[in-house]
């Protein structure tokens, strides 16, 4: 019986070693996920960009990530009114900049 067990054990170990174990459910699958969000409002005038990191993206904590003028990334809760105000301001500013960049100055 021992001669049959050894090859089976070796094969089982080889299979386990070759194929990675599946990740546990509920883990942060994405590398960029926020571990927590700040409830304290962030001044809108220091924010230059934003992006969403939601549960659908593999993140356990849904968040809006604001990038500041100095390059810091701050995680905020997407359901807060102050977060919506900053996002609206950034979208409005972005729309203005796109409108200005498409206009051509007259050639004199």
UniProtKB/Swiss-Prot annotation:
Q: Which residues form the signal peptide?
A: 1-25
List glycan-bearing residues.
100
What pairs make up the disulfide bonds? 33-59, 34-75
The terms under GO molecular function for this entry are:
CCR7 chemokine receptor binding; chemokine activity; chemokine receptor binding
Its keywords, alphabetically, are: Chemotaxis, Cytokine, Disulfide bond, Glycoprotein, Inflammatory response, Secreted, Signal
Give its localization. Secreted
- One BP annotation, GO: inflammatory response
Single GO cellular component term: extracellular space
Where does tissue-level expression of this protein occur?
A: Highly expressed by dendritic cells in mesenteric and peripheral lymph nodes. Significant expression in spleen (T cell zone or periarteriolar lymphatic sheath) and Peyer patches. Low expression in thymus.
> Per UniProt, what is one Pfam family of this protein?
IL8
Q: Which Gene3D superfamilies would you find in this protein's record?
A: 2.40.50.40
According to its UniProt entry, what is the function of this protein?
Strongly chemotactic for naive (L-selectinhi) CD4 T-cells and for CD8 T-cells and weakly attractive for resting B-cells and memory (L-selectinlo) CD4 T-cells. May play a role in promoting encounters between recirculating T-cells and dendritic cells and in the migration of activated B-cells into the T-zone of secondary lymphoid tissues. Binds to chemokine receptor CCR7. Binds to atypical chemokine receptor ACKR4 and mediates the recruitment of beta-arrestin (ARRB1/2) to ACKR4.
Question: PANTHER family, alphabetically?
Answer: C-C MOTIF CHEMOKINE 19, SMALL INDUCIBLE CYTOKINE A
Quaternary structure, from the entry: Interacts with TNFAIP6 (via Link domain).
Assigned protein family: Belongs to the intercrine beta (chemokine CC) family.
Name assigned to this protein: C-C motif chemokine 19
| Species | Mus musculus
Q: What's the gene?
A: Ccl19
